[in-house]
Amino acid sequence: MLIDKFGRPVTNLRISLTKECNLNCFYCHREGQQDGERTMTPEEIERIVRIASRLGIRNVKLTGGEPTVRPDIYEIIQRIRPYVVDLSMTTNGTTLYASAEKLKEAGLDRVNISLDTLDRKKYKMITGYDVLDQVLKGIRRATNLFYPVKLNMVVMRGINDDEIWDMIRFAGEVNAILQLIEIEVPREMENSQFFKDFFYPLKPLEEKFEKIAVEIRERKMHRRRKYFLPVDGKMVEVEVVRSMHNTTFCMNCTRLRLTADGYLKTCLLRKDDLIDILGPIRRGATDDELVKIFKRAVQLRKPYWIN
């Protein structure tokens, strides 16, 4: 197992398959990626995952952009499936109604679906597209095939902060887990107008959850809290993701990232941490040389928010 200088094990790999997306959400952080021309092939992705698995990284999440815009998404899943214990994907859900069964057959274990609002006009304002009904159909299809299904709601002040309880009820209705997520920006953007306008702190909401939850659990990843809330006769699982200035969150991060253009990246918010792995692969690097690249990336890891 790989362990960084801060004693944090690295067990998860988050792979961006593409920077392309069929939506245009105004707050998107693009997985912290910069512009790049290279695209990893299914064979190259498989090799990187195989090396990662050899080093004890056996939990993989596929992201984008929107990963399902890649026509070879099913091949990618099939290729990496043998090397991982848990294979999940974050998606905007626009293609799920048509693709969920094929994704399951290819070997995908579970999905996280971005859903910031249940209001059609708001959805179009946030994403640029009027496809909410299509996404909701995809969510219902997914909950019949995958378990668990998580709904990711980025809570934004003045936009959807009035829908939190509606979203909790919807999650209960479709038997999904709801993740409430604070907007996350690097230090240099904390004084930006964007952050001032839209950041909605979730700590007060967590304090309310603590009073009404039937059960509270804590995940190893980031020490996130999960609240089991009785709502409309159902037990709804709600997870709160608060990363801004959260040193506990950072000290319990077990994740390494792989950008769509083939760089290992240690932190979403950092810009000085890219380690090229695709270039060496294309220049004929051996497996042992790729192992050294992984180890070098892990030794670069450091908590972004730290006392």
Curated annotation (Swiss-Prot):
Its EC number is 4.1.99.22. S-adenosyl-L-methionine binds at residues 27, 65, 114, 189. PROSITE patterns: MOAA_NIFB_PQQE (PS01305), RADICAL_SAM (PS51918). It catalyses: GTP + AH2 + S-adenosyl-L-methionine = (8S)-3',8-cyclo-7,8-dihydroguanosine 5'-triphosphate + 5'-deoxyadenosine + L-methionine + A + H(+). Disulfide bonds: none annotated. [4Fe-4S] cluster 2 binds at residues 250, 253, 267. The gene is moaA. InterPro entries: Aldolase_TIM, Elp3/MiaA/NifB-like_rSAM, MoaA_arc, MoaA_NifB_PqqE_Fe-S-bd_CS, MoaA_twitch, MoCo_biosynth_MoaA/MoaC, rSAM. GO terms for biological process: Mo-molybdopterin cofactor biosynthetic process. SUPFAM superfamilies: Radical SAM enzymes. This is Probable GTP 3',8-cyclase. Residues 5-232 form the Radical SAM core domain. Its cofactor is [4Fe-4S] cluster. It is an enzyme of class 4 (lyase). It comes from Pyrococcus furiosus (strain ATCC 43587 / DSM 3638 / JCM 8422 / Vc1). [4Fe-4S] cluster 1 binds at residues 21, 25, 28. It holds the Pfam family Radical_SAM. CDD domains: Radical_SAM, Twitch_MoaA. Pathway: Cofactor biosynthesis; molybdopterin biosynthesis. GTP binds at residues 14, 61, 90, 150, 255-257. Catalyzes the cyclization of GTP to (8S)-3',8-cyclo-7,8-dihydroguanosine 5'-triphosphate. It comes from the Archaea. The lineage of its organism: Archaea, Methanobacteriati, Methanobacteriota, Thermococci, Thermococcales. Belongs to the radical SAM superfamily. MoaA family. Binds 2 [4Fe-4S] clusters. Binds 1 [4Fe-4S] cluster coordinated with 3 cysteines and an exchangeable S-adenosyl-L-methionine and 1 [4Fe-4S] cluster coordinated with 3 cysteines and the GTP-derived substrate. Keywords: 4Fe-4S, GTP-binding, Iron, Iron-sulfur, Lyase, Metal-binding, Molybdenum cofactor biosynthesis, Nucleotide-binding, S-adenosyl-L-methionine. GO terms for molecular function: 4 iron, 4 sulfur cluster binding; cyclic pyranopterin monophosphate synthase activity; GTP 3',8'-cyclase activity; GTP binding; metal ion binding; S-adenosyl-L-methionine binding.
